[in-house]
C-alpha cells in the first residue's frame, strides 16, 4: 500500500505513507465510534454489564470498552495528524506544511494527554467539552487546511473536499453519528489512497 518516492543517489528512499493513512485513520475513527456506541448501551436500559466488561485494574472505574474506545480515539487522531503532515509535504505553492503539521501534532498530543488524564483520574469525566474534544478539533482544523490547499493546488478533487465538509457536518450533529461521518470521510479521502506520481 505504501510507495517509494524517488531520492538522490546515496540517500535513503522515503516511503509515502499517505495512501495507508488515508485508509487507516478513518477506519480507526469508525471503530472508535462503534465501540463507544456499544459502551454506552449499558446506560440505556440499566444493564450494568455490557459497557463495563470486567474493568481494567489500571483504569480504575473504566470498563474495557471505555478503555478500548479511548485508545482507538487517540490512535485515530494520531493517524490524522500523521496524514496531515504527509499531505502538507505534498504542497508545492502554499507554505502550510510546517504550521499544519505542528497544529495536528499538538492536537494529537492533547487528545492523548486528556485521555490519560481521564483514565488515571487526574481529569474527571465532567471536564468541559472544549478540553475533552479540543485536541481532535485542532487536528481536524489542520487536516481541513491541508485539504483545502491541496484542492486549490489541483491535487485533490473538489468533490472530495465537499464530502469531507459533509462528514464534519454529520460529526457535529448531536445524534452520535460518528461512525457514519467517518465512512463519509473515508470516501472523501479515497483519491489519496492512490500513490502519487513523481513530478
Feature-to-residue mapping (PLM):
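Hydrophobic, aromatic-enriched alpha-helical segments typical of multi-pass transmembrane helices
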Residues: 2-199
